[in-house]
């Protein structure tokens, strides 16, 4: 059996989900400025179900409501490894979790356009799917995507998603 220090270290490691090049961590108040910038960029939100413009107060209210959400449905900040530092590039999460049918919807926004087309979306979605099945014990993870969002469709297919239907 490990020491209490081992337990503390293990808990700290589990609070962040690490991939090869990305990590998913809790959203912090200082992230709100970047999120506000991204959700008001029509190029970033083109494939998302967001409506422009969004005030900074709206974004702060969104952040303040996170404390009341089911911990399993809190969004995660996406960061990429840049040597000795981590760079915030977007957010993702699990939502509309159905405990009876053990399913949930996934969502992602890579807001930093300088980090587009580098495969981070597929890596993030793979981590989220693994988290859904191994940690949350779900049977099904799904998402919705606009058919014209080709970059996202490719990313989701790389992560193992298959087309079930079109609306």
List each language-model region with its residue ranges.
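Conserved catalytic-core motifs of GNAT/GCN5-like acyltransferases
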Residues: 142-145, 162-167
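GNAT-family acyltransferases
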Residues: 2-114
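Conserved beta-strand-loop-alpha-helix junction that forms the acyl-donor binding cleft
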Residues: 113, 143-153
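Amphipathic alpha-helical recognition patches that constitute DNA-binding helices
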Residues: 34, 105, 123, 140, ...
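Conserved hydrophobic/aromatic "anchor" residues
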Residues: 27, 131-133, 161
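Conserved acetyl-CoA-binding loop-helix of GNAT-fold acetyltransferases
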Residues: 117-131, 153-158
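Conserved GNAT acetyl-CoA-binding A-motif
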Residues: 134-144
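Conserved G/P- and acidic residue-centered "switch" motifs that form tight phosphate/ATP-binding loops
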Residues: 86, 119, 149
């Amino acid at each position: 059996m490990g020491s209490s220090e081992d337990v503390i270290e293990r808990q700290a490691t589990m609070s962040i989900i690490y991939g090869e090049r990305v990590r998913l961590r809790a959203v912090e108040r200082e992230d709100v400025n970047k999120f506000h910038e991204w959700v008001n960029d029509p190029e970033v939100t083109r494939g998302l179900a967001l409506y422009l413009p969004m005030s900074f107060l709206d974004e702060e209210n969104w952040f303040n409501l996170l404390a009341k959400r089911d911990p399993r449905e809190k969004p995660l900040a996406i960061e990429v490894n840049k040597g000795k530092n981590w760079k915030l590039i977007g957010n993702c999460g699990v939502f509309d979790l159905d405990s009876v049918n053990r399913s949930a919807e996934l969502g992602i926004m890579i807001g930093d356009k300088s980090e587009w087309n580098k495969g981070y979306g597929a890596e993030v979605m793979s981590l989220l799917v693994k988290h859904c099945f191994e940690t949350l014990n779900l049977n099904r993870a799904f998402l919705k995507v606009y058919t014209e969002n080709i970059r996202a469709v490719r990313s989701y297919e790389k992560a193992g998603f298959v087309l079930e239907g079109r609306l």
